[in-house]
């Protein structure tokens, strides 16, 4: 965990982790009924839609209450913000106190090794 984090951020990261584990999968209305419908969320807009009206025995609907705390939104569980790195030039823009590097999947093994070595010199955490 990032040592520079204050107690408030640590507490919010724990809450974010807890909320992520409890969050349900949101499926579109009647996704199970027709093969042509994907299960990706679509907001129900029908005039008589039971899901839109939040009737009982219906799956939960996407709502602001399911979001993680604003202060830690987009933050890695380690307490750093992720920065996607493609080459050595990208490393120079990273602030090691609040950001961590994630090497892109398209980077080959030779360049990946160079990037990891440079990150170690600059005390930048590599997430993968």
UniProtKB/Swiss-Prot annotation:
Keywords for the protein's UniProt record, in alphabetical order:
Ribonucleoprotein, Ribosomal protein
Under the heading PROSITE patterns, the entry gives: RIBOSOMAL_L32E (PS00580)
Question: Alphabetically, which GO biological process terms does the record hold?
Answer: translation
An example of a Gene Ontology cellular component annotation for this protein is: cytosolic large ribosomal subunit
The answer to whether the entry has keyword Ribosomal protein is yes
Cleaved signal peptide residues: none
Gene Ontology terms, MF aspect: structural constituent of ribosome
> What single Pfam family name could you report for this chain, choosing any that match?
Ribosomal_L32e
Q: Which family does it belong to?
A: Belongs to the eukaryotic ribosomal protein eL32 family.
For this protein, the record's HAMAP family field holds:
Ribosomal_eL32
Name the chain's protein: Large ribosomal subunit protein eL32
Origin organism is Thermoplasma volcanium (strain ATCC 51530 / DSM 4299 / JCM 9571 / NBRC 15438 / GSS1)
Q: Which lineage ranks, top first, belong to the organism behind this chain?
A: Archaea, Methanobacteriati, Thermoplasmatota, Thermoplasmata, Thermoplasmatales
As recorded in Swiss-Prot or TrEMBL, the protein's gene is named rpl32e
